[in-house]
Amino acid sequence: KKIGYCLACYHCKKSGGVCAIKDDMADILDKMNAADVIVMASPVYFYSIDAQMKALIDRTVAQWLTIRDKEFYYIMTAAEEGDTVMDCTLECFCGLAKCLKGSVERGVICGKGVYEPGEIESKPAMREAYDMGRQV
């Protein structure tokens, strides 16, 4: 999906939640409104979310008052294994949930020590993600 960056033009505020940027975000917002559960996932880049996830979160401003009562799950991966390496990433996810009325956070999975493609396969986070998915 293609998601452009928020321009902070607030066209959405003047047009009932319709963004001036014509990309895939309108479809994503429709799906977020319709969903009961939202899973946010990102690799950790410089102790934060990646640019694509940041763009999605920022563009949610167009309908932040209509996206409500959601259950949130978070999945993060990082090359480092430290306990605090994902704190800022988690805060970015939590920040979105805090802005959406009635939302609750249900689960967090941290895949630590993964850098190369496929490394996650042997980590406990892979099984945790599977188990969490079965519970949703």
Predicted stretch roles:
Residues 44-46, 78-83, 113-117:
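Short histidine/acidic/glycine/proline-rich micro-motifs that form metal-
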